[in-house]
């Protein structure tokens, strides 16, 4: 918003075409439904679309026909093993996200997650790393955490900026780092991203 761009969202919590929001989970993500949502976003003049893609949707190839400008791998955990059958199948499903990148696409990888960190030498696209504990292109240093908010400093190169958020936890910090990486890749100033 602060950058003057309209962004559509498809997540496990909501779907929005910029301003119109509905509660629709992504568990049943399928190519026709996704095409309909992306068309609605285009008609609503969204310049960007953020799509949360669960491993089950990746295994079912629900991004068929979609090429991504940016793919973010925040972590690879042992989730949905009842569906995938094994950790290896789960990891293969998650890695399909990188296969959806355009030739000029950007991969954003969590340097703190050992199961995503090993990918760095295997990705044939530009990569930005994010992290709290390990060395990364974009880092966060937690400063304070209380019951109602947390504060941390995001550093990208020589630029640092404090961020305060009412959503608590490291996972949210990783999400903020990933969003910062996307914004910087689009040429948005870090001060604008922090808003």
Mark where each language-model region is.
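Short beta->alpha connector loops
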Residues: 54-57, 113-114
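Conserved helix/coil segment N-terminal to the catalytic DExD/H
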Residues: 56-64
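Conserved nucleotide-sensing/catalytic segment adjacent to the nucleotide-binding pocket
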Residues: 23-54
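Short beta-strand-centered segment that lines the nucleotide-binding/catalytic pocket of NTP-utilizing
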Residues: 4-20, 53-54
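Acidic, Mg2+-coordinating active-site environments of NTP-dependent enzymes
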Residues: 44-47, 68-195
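Glycine-rich phosphate-binding P-loop
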Residues: 1
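Flexible beta-alpha connector loops of hexameric P-loop NTPases
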Residues: 20-31, 79-88
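Short hydrophobic/charged patches on amphipathic alpha-helices used for structural packing
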Residues: 35-39, 60, 95
């Amino acid at each position: 918003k602060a950058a003057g761009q309209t962004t559509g969202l498809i997540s496990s919590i909501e779907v929005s075409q910029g301003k119109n929001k509905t509660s629709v989970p992504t568990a049943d993500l399928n190519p026709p439904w996704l095409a309909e949502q992306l068309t609605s976003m285009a008609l609503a003049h969204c310049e960007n679309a953020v799509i949360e893609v669960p491993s089950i949707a990746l295994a079912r190839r629900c991004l068929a026909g979609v090429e991504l400008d940016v793919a973010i791998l925040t972590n690879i955990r042992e989730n949905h093993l009842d569906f995938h059958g094994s950790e290896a199948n789960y990891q293969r499903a998650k890695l399909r996200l990188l296969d959806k990148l355009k030739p000029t696409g950007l991969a954003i990888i969590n340097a703190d997650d050992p199961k995503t960190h090993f990918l760095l030498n295997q990705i044939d696209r530009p990569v930005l790393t994010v992290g709290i504990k390990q060395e990364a292109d974009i880092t966060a240093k937690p400063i304070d955490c209380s019951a109602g908010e947390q504060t941390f400093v995001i550093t990208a190169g020589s630029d640092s900026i404090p961020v305060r958020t009412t959503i608590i936890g490291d996972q949210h910090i990783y999400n903020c780092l990933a969003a910062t990486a996307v914004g910087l890749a689009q040429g948005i100033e870090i001060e604008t991203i922090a808003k």
